[in-house]
Amino acid sequence: MFAGLLVQANPMHIIHLKNGLTVGVEACQDGIFRIKVTPRSQFGESLMERYGILKTDWKEVKQKMTEDNTLWSLSTGKYEITIDEMTGKMSVKNAAGNEIISDLTFLTSENPLCGTLAKIINEKYAGLHVQSNGGIIGDDDGTFSEKDKAESGDPAKSSIISIRLEKGERFYGGGSTSREHIQHRGEMLRMWVTYQHTEIPMPFVMSSEGWGIFNNTTRKNFFDIGSHDPDVFNIYNTCDEADFYMMFGNSMPDVLNEYTRITGRTYVLPKWAYGLCFGPNMMENQFNILNDAVLFRQTKVPCDVLWLEPQWMEKRYDFSTKKKWNYKSFSPEPYWMADKYPKKLYDNLFIGRLRNMGFHLGLWLCEEYDPSITEEDAIAARKGLPQSGREHWMDHLTDFLDMGVEGFKLDPARTIDEHTFFKYYNGCTDKEMHNLNQVLLPKQMEEMERKHTGKRTWHHYTAGWSGTQHWGASTSGDNGGGMTALFDQLNLGMSGYMNTSCDVMSVEKDQRMQSLHFGTFLPWLQINSWFSMMQPFYFNEKEQNIYRDYMKLRYSLIPYIYSAALEGAMTGMPIVRAMPLMFPDDRNVDDMVHQYMFGQNFCVGIFSNEIYLPEGVWTDAWTGERITSRGEKISREYPDNRAGLLYIREGAIIPCQPDVQYIGTTPADTIILKIYPHGDSGYTMYEDDGESYAYETGAIAATRFECRQNGKIVEFTINPVQGTYKGMPSKRTYELEVCSGKRPSRIFLGNKRIKDWTFGKDNKTRLILGNIDKNDLTRVTIKY
């Protein structure tokens, strides 16, 4: 029977089932329900909530609770959840009365399915092994404490969330848990962070039918999505209770929006970090690095970030808080100032000289510490309680920031390892902390940098868990820049993680340029030499030219890329968009992996000379060929000076910028708009100051562009800018490049005919609109 409420902004309704289980239901907002189930009278604490990873400041939701015999219901207007107090069966329907979830049931360990799934899990993952790497990385063997001897844990302490599936329903997300598919119905996904297997699992999936589930636990769990029973989705938890969120919307983008609302909106890197981030060889000293910087500028290959691998440290792989520079190879300061504080940037030494050339410096780090100390001290401080007196590991890095370092590469060593012998300060074991550590590491990095500098920095980490997207960027780890990395990008994007990348060009020689093509169209781009030499000036002439051309293309697209990043921070939409996210009604793309949409306008082919073009008109970005597709796969050989296929969607409006050697944070004075007229289309360009956190409180400018093609007339409109940010230009020049394939007869600016335009051999019309005021509505009419 209905028992009562837990008092908060939106109450947790408590229901006691006839089978002895206690259920809690909270309507977080209209479209999000949080559900807890336990065999006890009290619910266990969520560490994700305790440490500020999950949203708790929900606004009050209008809701109505009803009881009808054994049926308990809670309605929020758009959705209603019903629980049968006799059986525990839960169902959800929308306002129209359509059932979205027909049967969701919590199964205790007494149910035979727990033992069945445990056996399947243990058999499936029996051969999973992490190679030890000379003591640098590799899971501990459990010598010092109890370690699960089976993947499933103890079946007698397990439980299952069991959901009946609908015919034709497809599932996406799960983080980097599958490197065979992006559509996961029929798969089992392992939610446990493991080096070179599942670095960023996210216990979240969304259905093609407009709903999603986030399993709010940090313990090992498994998503059996129709693998054991094709009509049932079972979440196997290695504990006897559950805490999960159900989210609903009209589409998968709606579900991503709600999921990232719960677990944190995606972090936006500083604008310059969306340029080329390059890691030189780990044997290079400061003079080699400075020479690299000079050659990047001389060879006109744009680059913004250089980082140092472990060679910068006095002690190689120094995990301590006492680390120092290797002053024999690097001079960020005079060596005799090594023990003098506070630290500062010397403009005439290594870091300052890089800054003078427009480069930002990052440092490689390895970490192994107890992150619960910092978190518990933060809680104690808020409550006015004493501190632990123990060191906060991240604090020692402020000295390097003061010297001019602007970010850190967080190596998987050894946070990604299991630490079954650890006695965590908060009293938890590694069973609760291992997955959580992967969020707390970038969280504490971001919080330290924000507090110390007030600016966004470049930092990224190989591993993660739900919520990691809010605290920084990621790479696919030590898995190269090939197909494994491609699966990670697609699956992470479908899990609300926007800032993803990989070790671009870390592939076999014959795929290296194809990997560069891939990397150019990633949210952020890193090329990691490590033991190699990936500098563009070490390649042959043909490859140098391809390298340069791709980097120049990348930099020209920075307004488009950065706009997509800000959009992602507001909505949860990734920059790399798997095809089913953009074309959900096209069954041909359900599990498509050799291509994706880059933002809303580019279709990028990866490691293949075949590409599927959904229904519509597409333009070959390299040749200008226009293809009217009925939804079909085509084969094309890309030009000799390119390394992959690239198509532009009908109606596209793409903001670009003139050639630059580095980005900085200053907004572009001139925006080049590449326009592909087709019917009615539009595009909103988002901008901010490029480095502060003001975007989080709305300091974003939005410029809406609209194009209308009607017969022989194309009408293009630049609307007044909405919103503002520090440093926003009051006026701007727009260069229009209209790709209609026909020579205009007349062009009008407002009602005035203009003659200062050109029509080139590439069948593109170009005109310049100078000094356009941000408050003006500007309209160009082209007649053919």
PLM features per residue range, with description:
Residues 447-457, 466-475, 494-498, 502, ...:
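Catalytic core of carbohydrate-active enzymes
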Residues 25, 78, 204, 296, ...:
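Conserved, mostly hydrophobic/aromatic
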Residues 47-63, 620-641, 746-770:
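Solvent-exposed beta-strand/loop surfaces of large extracellular or lumenal domains
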Residues 23-25, 35-37, 73-74, 78, ...:
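Short, well-ordered beta-strand segments enriched in hydrophobic/aromatic residues
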Residues 47-52, 302-551, 580-584, 592, ...:
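Aromatic- and carboxylate-enriched substrate-binding clefts and catalytic-loop regions
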Residues 26-74, 109-114:
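A low-complexity, Ser/Thr/Gly/Pro-enriched, surface-exposed linker/loop concept
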Residues 1-12:
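Bacterial Sec-dependent N-terminal signal peptides
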